[in-house]
From Swiss-Prot:
Protein name, entry field: Ribonuclease P protein component 3
Source organism phylogeny: Archaea, Methanobacteriati, Methanobacteriota, Thermococci, Thermococcales
Pfam family, one: RNase_P_p30
Keyword Cytoplasm: yes
Enzyme class label: hydrolase
Keyword set, alphabetical order: Cytoplasm, Endonuclease, Hydrolase, Nuclease, tRNA processing
A molecular-function term among this protein's GO annotations: ribonuclease P activity
Cited HAMAP family: RNase_P_3
Subcellular location field: Cytoplasm
Originating species: Pyrococcus abyssi (strain GE5 / Orsay)
Similarity-based family: Belongs to the eukaryotic/archaeal RNase P protein component 3 family.
Length: 212
């Protein structure tokens, strides 16, 4: 699918093969995320790269040593994402210069970043990923809280000019949404229309240029 109007839409975080195949029909480029927690399997990464091309190492609630290893050994060839609600892990990951922190508000009672962390992200070039999937899986009460924290995180992102992207973070095919639907999520949390489009096109393209 072409973005239209010269835009190229990018899905930055897909975690399942069926979801990837559907996303490829709707987006111009798709990043396949390979999830690791305790150790990084090089052969699994190579296989993913052969199958999907653009690959991210997704570290979920990782030990700090795994974040360090990922950045030192693998950043040249892969994007590095961290998904964690632990502030120490988030801060360390930003300091190390991972490519993105994804949905740090999930599992917390706050946005997961503050003014200090947002400034650090801008300085280090670390993006913030706004993920749809937690909203799809949440109860109505939790959904309202997640949206509240996403709005606050967006305000900080906008204020400090942090890189950003909107993504499905799809674990299953049914999590995938059209670019227009993801842009609508951006508008709901306070983005202007052009900002939402940029979070699906301009900023992802900037992030991906590191690998090209």
């Amino acid at each position: 699918m072409a973005g239209g109007g010269g835009l190229k839409f990018v899905e930055m975080d897909v975690r399942n093969d069926d979801a990837y195949k559907l996303a490829k029909e709707w987006f111009d480029e798709v990043v396949f995320s390979v999830k690791f927690q305790d150790s990084i399997d090089k052969e699994l990464l190579r296989e993913a790269e052969r199958n999907y091309g653009l690959v991210a190492i997704l570290l979920v609630n990782p030990r700090l040593s795994i974040v360090k290893e990922a950045v030192q050994r693998f950043k040249q060839n892969y994007l590095i994402y961290v998904e964690s609600s632990d502030l120490r892990t988030i801060r360390y990951s930003i300091e190390r210069g991972v490519d993105a922190i994804i949905s740090p508000w999930v599992g917390r009672k706050d946005p997961g970043i503050d003014h200090t962390l947002a400034r650090m992200m801008a300085k280090k070039g670390v993006a913030l990923g706004f993920s749809l999937r937690p909203l799809l899986e949440a109860s109505p009460y939790d959904k309202a809280n997640i949206l509240k924290f996403m709005r606050k995180a967006w305000q900080l992102t906008n204020k400090y000019k942090v890189k950003r992207f909107i993504t499905s973070s799809a674990n299953e095919k049914w999590h995938i949404r059209w670019p227009r639907d993801l842009a609508t999520l951006g508008i709901i949390i306070g983005m202007e229309v052009q900002q939402a489009k940029a979070a699906l096109s301009t900023y992802p393209d900037i992030i991906l240029k590191r690998l090209k």
